[in-house]
């Protein structure tokens, strides 16, 4: 029983500022939640631009210069056409272009099509290298396998 009380005293001592019984416990410092304030400021500035919600948008893809894509599935989109401003809300995922290829062919611009061609060429080159690494010699008419091995 005595060692339990000693352990409790050690635990209690770490949670107190002073050493006396009447001292208050240490307050936990918490960082203020700023994301809500940032969202409110963003909403206010978008409201000044007179943005309107755009309905029925299934996905948004943003093509990056390195060939990857930021993909938003079922985002909320607001637009202010006169000021050429668009706001996209949702969880974005970084994906490679090859993951989205069948569904986004009609969305690709000339730059993205060029990067897609490069990806296809590199994929074909990798496949050819895999096929060539078999270490099986090619046979020519009139030669036998034993002659080729020696």
From Swiss-Prot:
Residues 36-101 form the NAC-A/B domain. One of its GO terms (biological process) is protein transport. It comes from the Eukaryota. One of its GO terms (cellular component) is nascent polypeptide-associated complex. Residues 1-45, 123-150 are annotated as: Disordered. Residues 23-32 have a biased composition (Basic residues). Keywords: Cytoplasm, Nucleus, Protein transport, Repressor, Transcription, Transcription regulation, Transport. InterPro entries: BTF3, NAC_A/B_dom_sf, Nas_poly-pep-assoc_cplx_dom. Part of the nascent polypeptide-associated complex (NAC), consisting of EGD2 and EGD1. NAC associates with ribosomes via EGD1. Component of the nascent polypeptide-associated complex (NAC), a dynamic component of the ribosomal exit tunnel, protecting the emerging polypeptides from interaction with other cytoplasmic proteins to ensure appropriate nascent protein targeting. The NAC complex also promotes mitochondrial protein import by enhancing productive ribosome interactions with the outer mitochondrial membrane and blocks the inappropriate interaction of ribosomes translating non-secretory nascent polypeptides with translocation sites in the membrane of the endoplasmic reticulum. Belongs to the NAC-beta family. This is Nascent polypeptide-associated complex subunit beta. It comes from Chaetomium globosum (strain ATCC 6205 / CBS 148.51 / DSM 1962 / NBRC 6347 / NRRL 1970).
């Amino acid at each position: 029983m005595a060692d339990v009380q000693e352990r409790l005293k050690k635990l209690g001592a770490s949670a107190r500022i002073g050493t006396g019984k009447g001292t208050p416990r240490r307050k936990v410092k918490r960082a203020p939640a700023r994301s809500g304030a940032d969202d409110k400021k963003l909403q206010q500035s978008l409201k000044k631009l007179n943005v309107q919600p755009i309905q029925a948008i299934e996905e948004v893809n943003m093509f990056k210069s390195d060939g990857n894509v930021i993909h938003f599935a079922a985002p909320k989109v607001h637009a202010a056409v006169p000021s050429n401003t668009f706001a996209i809300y949702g969880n974005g995922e970084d994906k490679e272009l090859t993951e989205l290829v069948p569904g986004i062919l009609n969305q690709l611009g000339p730059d993205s099509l060029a990067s897609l061609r490069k990806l296809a060429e590199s994929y074909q080159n990798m496949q050819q290298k895999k096929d060539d690494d078999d270490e099986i010699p090619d046979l020519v008419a009139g030669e036998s396998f034993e002659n080729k091995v020696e």
